[in-house]
Amino acid sequence: MKKLVILRGNSGSGKTTVARALQRKIGFNTMLISQDEIRRNMLWVKDGIDTKALPLMIELLKYGNEHSDIVILEGIMYDEWYN
C-alpha cells in the first residue's frame, strides 16, 4: 500500500458516498474497506469498544498494505473504540 485514505465522520455525513466516488475516480488497484460493510453485512455484530469487526478490519488493512496501491478506510470509528 502506498497510500491510506481514512474517511471518518458522523452517521449520514456521506463517508461511504465519498469513499465509493474516490475509489471509482482512482480506479485500478484501490481497495475500499467499509466499517459498516464489515460490521453489518459480513459479521452481523454491533459496534462498540470490543467489536469483533476491528480484528477483521486490521487484517484487511494488512492485506491492502501488501496488495493495493491505495486503501480507503471509511466509517464512524469513534476515537474511544478504535484507538
Predicted segments, located by residue:
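Pre-Walker A (Motif I) flank of P-loop NTPase domains
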Residues: 1-4, 68-69
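Hydrophobic anchor at the beta1->P-loop junction of P-loop NTPases
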Residues: 7
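Short catalytic-loop micro-motif centered on adjacent basic/acidic residues
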Residues: 71-75
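P-loop (Walker A) phosphate-binding loop of NTP-binding proteins
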Residues: 10
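Conserved substrate/cofactor phosphate-moiety recognition/catalytic segment
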Residues: 13, 17-69
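ATP-dependent NMP and nucleoside kinases share a basic, alpha-helical "lid"
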Residues: 77-83
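Short coil/turn segments at secondary-structure boundaries
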Residues: 48, 76-77
